[in-house]
Design a protein with these regions (language model features):
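Non-heme Fe(II)-dependent double-stranded beta-helix
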Residues: 1-28, 35-128, 134-137, 174
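Conserved hydrophobic/aromatic beta-strand scaffold that supports enzyme active sites
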Residues: 15, 31-33, 144-148, 158
Length: 195
């Protein structure tokens, strides 16, 4: 049985070559924006599959006004790859694994979890935070692939990074909250890291 359309399966198994300059940029800044990792056709396909999963698995029933800052930031659903074979093919794809491995300069990668984050209209900002707070791992060889499933102009609040902020330890002990926004924003101003 074929899980994915042939063109999408082929794309997920093809390499996405990185230049030495891209790897160097990532090593220096601990983030990079890579364009056209996935085709529009592939993104549309997975948008449908992931949206169906989130609609099925989402347990948030409170109104926005009843939620704290973290709860307003986004709807989140974890480990969709365990629930849906199409999502599993994306999450465990050779293409994404190769990019992660090349950027971190490792021989291979393992997945900790996948996560779908859906911003709701009027939900507010996602406070500055450090993902390490949520990952009980001792290694700094960790990476996130943020894959927007639609065009995300500045007005929609796309993901923002602060170059070099991986060198800051302030905030690693803070959950996503109003406090993480204040403390990390304060540290970013002091260090003058671009973001």
């Amino acid at each position: 049985m074929t899980i994915l359309p042939d063109t999408i399966a082929l794309e997920l198994n093809q390499p996405y070559p990185l230049t030495p300059e891209q790897v160097d940029f990532y090593q220096r800044n601990r983030y990079i924006k890579l364009k056209h990792v996935l085709s529009t056709n592939t993104l549309d396909y997975f948008n449908d599959a992931i949206t169906r999963c989130v609609n099925t698995l989402n347990t948030e029933t409170r109104e926005l006004t009843e939620r704290d800052t973290y709860g307003k930031a986004f709807i989140q659903t974890f480990n969709l790859w365990l629930q849906n074979p199409q999502v599993k093919a994306l999450v465990l794809s050779k293409r994404l694994a190769q990019i992660a491995s090349d950027l971190m300069q490792t021989q291979g990668v393992r997945i900790y979890h996948d996560q779908a984050l859906f911003k709701e209209s009027g939900g507010g900002i996602t406070p500055w935070h450090d993902d390490q707070y949520y990952w009980p791992l001792q290694s700094d060889k960790t990476i996130t692939a943020w894959i927007p499933l639609q065009a995300t102009p500045l007005e929609m609040g796309p993901l923002e990074f602060s170059a070099g902020s991986h060198q800051i330890v302030t905030g690693r002990d803070l959950e996503i909250s109003d406090n993480s926004e204040i403390e990390i924003q304060k540290q970013l101003r002091v260090t003058n890291f671009p973001h």
